[in-house]
Amino acid sequence: MAAITSWITDSGCKDHASLVSIAKLAEQAERYEDMAVAMKTIAEMGNELNNEERNLLSVAYKNVVGARRSSWRIMSSIAKKQAGTPLADQTDIYLKKVEEELTKICNDVLALLSKNLITEKIGAEAKIFYYKMMGDYYRYLAEVQEGEQNDKSTEAAEEAYQKATSLAEAELSVTHPIRLGLALNFSVFYYEIKNMPEKACSLAKAAFDAAITEVDSIKDETYKDSTLIMQLLRDNLTLWNSECETDS
């Protein structure tokens, strides 16, 4: 059974331009499942995605999985409160259903990345984008897993983030939004998944400090994205600072 269902699958549409148009319309209508299926169909056709199309794919799945991540957090909190009560079993069953949906979507994205999108022919920027995305979706899996499964997803996330980082440091400027977004998410991974606040702070601070020295050279078309991510890095550093100082 597919992780996401949509009328687009039944329509049999395989025209690249039409699918991109559908994805854009679906985004405006906030129908992210349709948006994800449209972009997945393009990727499975073997077409290399341009920058706009990569962003459409990312936004679609981020919203689809984001809804499940939010539901899982809420249900997980409710399950803890209801432990030992008559509603405990029912709550646990519902939590598992949300978890299964989230897991299927993440595995869907990871399969798409490894089988269709990360190829030898793509450029460095696309490869960094996809390895970052791979790290993100293994991180989302690790959030809901325990034991050996958690260990495997955590290791895979770190490996993907590290591959993206090595490429980004060689190929992208310190103010490039993809490089900054990667540093943001990698630092969140260390803070939330590996419980390493000092490492998280170090990574986030290095990215912010490097970017702030070059802020005047940011291109107009990426200025808004780059400065927004820099602000998010600074916000996290402010939030984490007390723990970093305690651990150091």
Curated annotation (Swiss-Prot):
Gene3D superfamilies: 14-3-3 domain
Disulphide bridges: none
InterPro entries tied to this protein: 14-3-3, 14-3-3_CS, 14-3-3_dom_sf, 14-3-3_domain
Family classification: Belongs to the 14-3-3 family.
Record protein name field: 14-3-3 protein homolog 2
High-level lineage: Eukaryota, Metazoa, Spiralia, Lophotrochozoa, Platyhelminthes
